């Protein structure tokens, strides 16, 4: 009764109005589940391939009918009759069927939609919440949220080079309280920006995108919003950034157009270090470009003992690339994005490898999202401790936060919120 009776893909729209893949899997028992695939704006060059049609006469070339056709033909034929409870076997079948290193024949978007939907319907068959199915009986840690409240870089049409400025309400004792704190700070920031004459429209991930003098002004606005919301920066609320440095890495130099500065790797590392000295900055994502492994080594040597250095573009949720990074001592954390690798099994393998190497993990959304809340369950399932799923508006972001509220409620007294543990471990990014 847990065997797969049908696999059906369809083209839907994501939060940016671009097509994406949704897959529905039905079991012989009649149970059915669906999953929708996200899409990124700033992407690593070694990510698994997201298949687009390229037909400029339809959705400006961004249609996904080819990927959907693969779901409804080759993939469906290969999976019919398979046991939905055999996730590893299902994902290995998808990988073998594709036959490429980067999932370019079938498309990672086609494969991931199927993989996620199979996991969800299997959980339903067993009568388990998805997080318990993915993680087992010890799945209980509610992640500290990284809330993106000011956008720059590829996510906003302004003069900020850093892509994301985030708050982390680590002083809360529950996820529910951390969400409330973040929301209050978000609305306070909106009021402050509006009072100062800045536009308060939001970017792809729900953060504000004001034109500011420099990055220090962005930090200053956030600190002011934290304080005026009634919280203490550095004890109750920490900061995090996603520099997305690959986006401004040109010919071996880091060209910060908004700042009017050009840095080499050592200078950029020092620029980042200065932020950690001035602000309660505990986490820096993609502080160096994906191809600048020497720069990553410098940054890790400089800050790695007291700041979380998250590798996104440099690792692209790929276990073989992560293994290289661990061997080279690059970064101390990895961002986990399901669609960078293309199957649930490979994602879980990468998370396990990171944990064995004492790298932290941050479960992440993409800038082009859907209402699917799979990553909320994944974060709790693997006890990641951190999640990055956007700002405090836009329903495709709220769907993840609201699912975490439900999970915390369901876990009751067993729930553990990771915020205070994170704050203690990183000492809020201060230097002795």
From Swiss-Prot:
InterPro entries: Enolase, Enolase-like_C_sf, Enolase-like_N, Enolase_C, Enolase_CS, Enolase_N. Its EC number is 4.2.1.11. It holds the Pfam family Enolase_C. Pathway: Carbohydrate degradation; glycolysis; pyruvate from D-glyceraldehyde 3-phosphate: step 4/5. SMART domains: Enolase_C, Enolase_N. Keywords: Cytoplasm, Glycolysis, Lyase, Magnesium, Metal-binding, Secreted. Mg(2+) binds at residues 242, 285, 312. One of its GO terms (biological process) is glycolytic process. GO terms for cellular component: cell surface; extracellular region; phosphopyruvate hydratase complex. Catalyzes the reversible conversion of 2-phosphoglycerate (2-PG) into phosphoenolpyruvate (PEP). It is essential for the degradation of carbohydrates via glycolysis. This is Enolase. The lineage of its organism: Bacteria, Pseudomonadati, Thermodesulfobacteriota, Desulfovibrionia, Desulfovibrionales.
């Amino acid at each position: 009764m847990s065997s797969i009776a049908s696999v059906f893909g369809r083209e839907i729209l994501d939060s940016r109005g671009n097509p994406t893949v949704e897959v529905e899997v039905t079991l012989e028992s009649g149970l059915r589940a669906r999953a929708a695939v996200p899409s990124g704006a700033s992407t690593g060059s070694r990510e698994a391939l997201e298949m687009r049609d390229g037909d400029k006469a339809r959705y400006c070339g961004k249609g996904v009918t080819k990927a959907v056709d693969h779901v409804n033909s080759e993939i469906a034929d290969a999976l019919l009759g398979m046991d939905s409870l055999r996730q590893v076997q299902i994902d290995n079948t998808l990988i073998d069927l594709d036959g490429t290193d980067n999932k370019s024949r079938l498309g990672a978007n086609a494969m991931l939609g199927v993989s996620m939907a199979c996991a969800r319907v299997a959980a339903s068959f067993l009568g388990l919440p998805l997080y318990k199915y993915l993680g087992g009986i010890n799945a209980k840690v509610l992640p500290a949220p990284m809330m993106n409240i000011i956008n720059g870089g590829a996510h906003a049409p302004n003069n900020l080079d850093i892509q994301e400025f985030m708050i982390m309400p680590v002083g809360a004792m529950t996820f529910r309280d951390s969400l409330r704190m973040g929301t209050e700070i978000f609305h306070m920031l909106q009021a402050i920006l509006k009072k100062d004459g800045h536009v308060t429209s939001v970017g792809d991930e729900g953060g504000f995108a004001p034109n500011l003098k420099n990055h220090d002004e962005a930090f200053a606005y956030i600190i002011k919003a934290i304080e005026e919301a009634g919280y203490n920066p550095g004890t109750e609320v920490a900061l995090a950034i996603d520099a997305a440095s690959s986006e401004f890495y040109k010919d071996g130099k880091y060209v910060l157009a908004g700042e009017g500065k050009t840095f080499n790797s050592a200078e950029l590392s020092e620029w980042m270090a200065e932020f950690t000295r001035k602000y309660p900055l505990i986490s820096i994502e993609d502080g160096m470009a994906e191809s600048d492994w020497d720069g990553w080594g410098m940054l890790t040597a400089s800050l790695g003992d007291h700041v979380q250095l998250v590798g996104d573009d440099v690792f692209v949720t790929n276990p073989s690339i992560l293994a290289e990074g661990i061997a080279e001592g690059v970064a101390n954390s990895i961002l986990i994005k399901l669609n960078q690798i293309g199957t649930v099994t490979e994602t879980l393998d990468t998370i396990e490898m990171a944990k064995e190497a004492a790298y932290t993990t941050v479960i992440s959304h993409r800038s082009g999202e859907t209402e699917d809340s799979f990553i909320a369950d994944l974060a709790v399932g693997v006890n990641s401790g951190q999640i990055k799923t956007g700002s405090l508006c836009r329903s495709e972001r709220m769907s993840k936060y609201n699912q975490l509220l439900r999970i915390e409620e369901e876990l009751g007294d067993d729930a553990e919120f990771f915020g205070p543990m994170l704050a203690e471990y990183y000492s809020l990014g201060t230097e002795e």
